[in-house]
Structure formats: structure tokens, C-alpha cells
């Protein structure tokens, strides 16, 4: 099966998952949201989205084995032991698939079918073979609040990401450079996709529209750049890096991989992903976004300037932080990153020395 056929299947899967998430978002119930054992929030949309993508890939790629690396599994769902929740997810999945003409007469789905579809996401990935990488609802907190979230699906072949699709149901269709991500409600909802050597495109999620090719910003003066970061406890090194570059604007806060999508079409120039302490980064949080940016002419590296390595299993092999920007800005940005890390390490050494004395 060609990559074009796989891309078509991925677009269909992600579009239907976005349709399900929109239905949940229209009337989010208290019982639709709970906390997992790691205290992170999860919703019926997370599980429904994963089940839809899993089932669509299975149906569309009938002659291809589907290895899926995804965020959720049914273990957490079984822990809450709520038949009503599982029944709601099952109905959401059934209704979503039935809304597509090609699936309207498919065999009825049971709750066990949905649980099995969710658990198809237990693959470990790795450097050999083909693996789909799914973020079923990226930015669950944003989804719950009615803010930005994304559904990202990528294909890994022999350790390399070769295509990616991302639905951003709350992102304005028109480019929002300098517009603080504001738009008319009827113009909201984007589907981004890209594949190796073919560029990145965007089209409407809600209506039939011709795809438009997108490219990263042409700004080459770091002081004029704007940057994205997640909603979380402020990370001091972000401010240090921005200061070294001469960036004066406050960061644009966006949940999820939507930052990759916005950067790919020039809504901003820099996305930094550093944490206070080094921690594992799940591949599903970056796989689709990385190829969407790179095919739009951008660069995605770790803090040392190395390309992100998605071949090591469920977690990225990377150095210290993630840097997403344009080719024009990357050299100066990496210099600022190296200087900032060095200063941070020196400060930590001083603090440790003072404690000893």
C-alpha cells in the first residue's frame, strides 16, 4: 500500500475522531471526565477518539498489519468500573462511524469491540517495521475548558516519521499571525497533514475545501519572533532564551500539538519545550507535529540540535529540551539555548556548593 493511500486513511481516521470529540464537547458531562492513576485528566473523548482511529485504520488498511502506539489503554477505563461510561463511549464510537457513508452498514459494535480497539494501541513501536503513533486528545485540559486541543496521528517507518495528520478543532482556519488566535466561530477547525518530500497542507475540518499549502514564517530577526509554550508552571529557561534572542512579546499559550500546527503556517516562529526536570517525553506528543513543521520548512530538534529520535519505543531519546522553529532562526536559537543551559547548570552548581558549606 502506498503512502498516499495510508495518508488518505489517516486523514479519514483523524477527521472522524475530531467529529467524535466535537460531539462530546457540545455537551460535556461531569461523568465524562475523571483523573487517571497518575492524576492526569481523561475523558470519554480520549477513549472514543482512540477507538475510532484504531477501527478506521483496521478497516481502511485491511491488507496491512496495524501496529498502533497510543496514549490510552482500557486498564484505566476498567478501573472506574462504570458500565454507563463504557456504554457512552461505545455509542459515541458507533454513531461517529455510522456518520460516514462507507461505514453505515458495517457490523454492529459491542463494548468489547471498543475495548479491543483501544487496546490495539499497546504497541511499543521501535526502529523496525511500520507503527502508527496516536495522540487521541492532545491537551485534555484544554479540551475540557473548551480551548485548544489536537488529535495527532503519524506513521513511523523503520524508525522515521514519514507522514502526519493533525486535527485542530478549535484553531481558526485563517492564519492568525499577529491576531492572538482569534477568529469568527464559523471559521474554526483545521486539518493539517504532511508527508516526506510533499510539503504540509491545511484544509477545513467542517466543510469540503481545497487544501492549501502552508509554510513557516519568513521572519529572520529573532527580536521580531513570537514563541509558543504550553500552559504549565513557568519554566525560567524559556524566559532566559527569549531574552538572549531579544524577544519582548509574552509567549503565546496554547495547549497540545496545536503549537506545531500554528507554527507550520507562520502564526509564530518558536516553540520551546523545556521542563524544570528532565522527564520522559512520549512520542505521541510530538510525532505528527514534527513532520508537519519540517515539511512546512521548519526544524524540530532537541536542545543539542539533534533531530528527534522516535525509534526508541514509547519515549523520545532527546537532550534536555525540544526546540521547534524556522531554518533561518535555528542557529541563533540553539546558541541561546546552549548559553542558557550552561548558565542554569552553573547556578545549580553554585547553589549546591552553598548548601554543602
UniProtKB/Swiss-Prot annotation:
Residues involved in adenosine 3',5'-bisphosphate binding: 140, 256, 259, 273
Matches recorded under SUPFAM superfamilies: Carbohydrate phosphatase
Binding site for Mg(2+) 2: 135
Enzyme type, top EC level: hydrolase
Cofactor: Mg(2+)
Residues that span the membrane, as ranges: none
Residues annotated to bind Mg(2+) 3: 71
Keywords carried by this UniProt record: Hydrolase, Magnesium, Metal-binding, Multifunctional enzyme
Pathway participation: Signal transduction; phosphatidylinositol signaling pathway
Pfam families: Inositol_P
Active-site residues, Swiss-Prot/TrEMBL: 46 (proton acceptor), 140 (proton acceptor)
Free-text function comment from the UniProt entry: Phosphatase that converts adenosine 3'-phosphate 5'-phosphosulfate (PAPS) to adenosine 5'-phosphosulfate (APS) and 3'(2')-phosphoadenosine 5'-phosphate (PAP) to AMP. Is also able to hydrolyze inositol 1,4-bisphosphate and inositol 1,3,4-trisphosphate.
Protein's name according to its UniProt entry: Probable 3'(2'),5'-bisphosphate nucleotidase 3
Amino acid at each position: 500500500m502506498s503512502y498516499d493511500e495510508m495518508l488518505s486513511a489517516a486523514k479519514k481516521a483523524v477527521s472522524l475522531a475530531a467529529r467524535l470529540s466535537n460531539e462530546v464537547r457540545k455537551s460535556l458531562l461531569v461523568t465524562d471526565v475523571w483523573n487517571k492513576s497518575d492524576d492526569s485528566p481523561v475523558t470519554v473523548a480520549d477513549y472514543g477518539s482512540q477507538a475510532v482511529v484504531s477501527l478506521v485504520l483496521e478497516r481502511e488498511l485491511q491488507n496491512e498489519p496495524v501496529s498502533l502506539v497510543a496514549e490510552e489503554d482500557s486498564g484505566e477505563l476498567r478501573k472506574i468500573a462504570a458500565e454507563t461510561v463504557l456504554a457512552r463511549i461505545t455509542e459515541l464510537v458507533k454513531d461517529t462511524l455510522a456518520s460516514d457513508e462507507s461505514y453505515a452498514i458495517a457490523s454492529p459494535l459491542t463494548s468489547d469491540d471498543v475495548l479491543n480497539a483501544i487496546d490495539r494501541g499497546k504497541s511499543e513501536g521501535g526502529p523496525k517495521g511500520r507503527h502508527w503513533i496516536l495522540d487521541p486528545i492532545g491537551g485534555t485540559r484544554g479540551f475540557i475548558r473548551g480551548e485548544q486541543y489536537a488529535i495527532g496521528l503519524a506513521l513511523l517507518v523503520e524508525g522515521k516519521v514519514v507522514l502526519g495528520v493533525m486535527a485542530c478543532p478549535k484553531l481558526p482556519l485563517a492564519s492568525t499571525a499577529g491576531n492572538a488566535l482569534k477568529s469568527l466561530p464559523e471559521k474554526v477547525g483545521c486539518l493539517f497533514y504532511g508527508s516526506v518530500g510533499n510539503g504540509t497542507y491545511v484544509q477545513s475540518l467542517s466543510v469540503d475545501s481545497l487544501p492549501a499549502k502552508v509554510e513557516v514564517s519568513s521572519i529572520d530577526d529573532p527580536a521580531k519572533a513570537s514563541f509558543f509554550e504550553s500552559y504549565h508552571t513557568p519554566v525560567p529557561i524559556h524566559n532566559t532564551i527569549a531574552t538572549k534572542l531579544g524577544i519582548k512579546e509574552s509567549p503565546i499559550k496554547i495547549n497540545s500539538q496545536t503549537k506545531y500546527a500554528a507554527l507550520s503556517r507562520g502564526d509564530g516562529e518558536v516553540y520551546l519545550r523545556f521542563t524544570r526536570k528532565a522527564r520522559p517525553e512520549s512520542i505521541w506528543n510530538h510525532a505528527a507535529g514534527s513532520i508537519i513543521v519540517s515539511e512546512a520548512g521548519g526544524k524540530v530538534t532537541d536542545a543539542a540540535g539533534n533531530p528527534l529520535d522516535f525509534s526508541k519505543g514509547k519515549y523520545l531519546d532527546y537532550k534536555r529540551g525540544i526546540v521547534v522553529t524556522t531554518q533561518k532562526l535555528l542557529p541563533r536559537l540553539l546558541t541561546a539555548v546552549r548559553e542558557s543551559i550552561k548558565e542554569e547548570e552553573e547556578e545549580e552548581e553554585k547553589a549546591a556548593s552553598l548548601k554543602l558549606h
